[in-house]
Amino acid sequence: MNAVYSHLAKTYDRELHDMQYTAYLKVPQLVIEELGHRQASILDLGCGTGLSSLLIFEKGYDVTGIDGTSAMIRRARKLPYKKIIQQDLESPWRVRDHSFNAAVMVGVMEYIIYPGVLFRQVRNKLVDGGVFGLTVPYKSKCYEDANLKSYYRKEITPVIRKAGFNIESSEKTLGFEDAGQKVAYLNYLLRKRQTTSSSD
């Protein structure tokens, strides 16, 4: 995946625009509406060139980005991230537990091999009641042909709940068009369930 995105880095934003890709606007907006005007720290997972945090920066939130592709990160560093960390999202993240009010992850789930592990890691980084906005690719032959992950709601819902999240909202929307084929996303807003004194 890193090799693919390193090659795309220079033209990535323009190509998404040409594909009429809007998930990078819709999912962050869900998080912004939930957080309101209070000061907040946000984790941008798979931040890429920073598109998924453009609306978030406008609100003045502190944003930490994580991405595995150096070429993408070089572009993201031009934006007002508080911190950017280069690492694989399926490795333990080098950020403190229970230190973020929200997380966003757009256009990443199709590459994640172990979604349950990733969801639990997100949960550990959020404060109690923290929110997680993300896209989940809706089951499609387009993804299967490319050896990427995609899901029906009934497949991903138990994974989400088992990881310790409640589903606040989910909406099926057009993600993009590929060779004339419409590819859909499920846009989710999740909330971390409250911890108890006996368990994390």
Residue ranges of each PLM-predicted region?
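Class I SAM-dependent methyltransferase SAM/SAH-binding core
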Residues: L43-L45, T49-P92
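Conserved class I S-adenosyl-L-methionine
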Residues: M1-L35, G133-T157
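Conserved S-adenosyl-L-methionine
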Residues: N166-G175
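A short glycine-rich, Lys/Arg-flanked "PGG" loop and its adjoining helix->strand segment in the class I
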Residues: G116-D128
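Short catalytic micro-motifs in class I SAM-dependent methyltransferases
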Residues: G107-V108
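A conserved beta-strand element that flanks and buttresses the S-adenosyl-L-methionine
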Residues: V104
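Core SAM-dependent methyltransferase catalytic element
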Residues: E177-D200
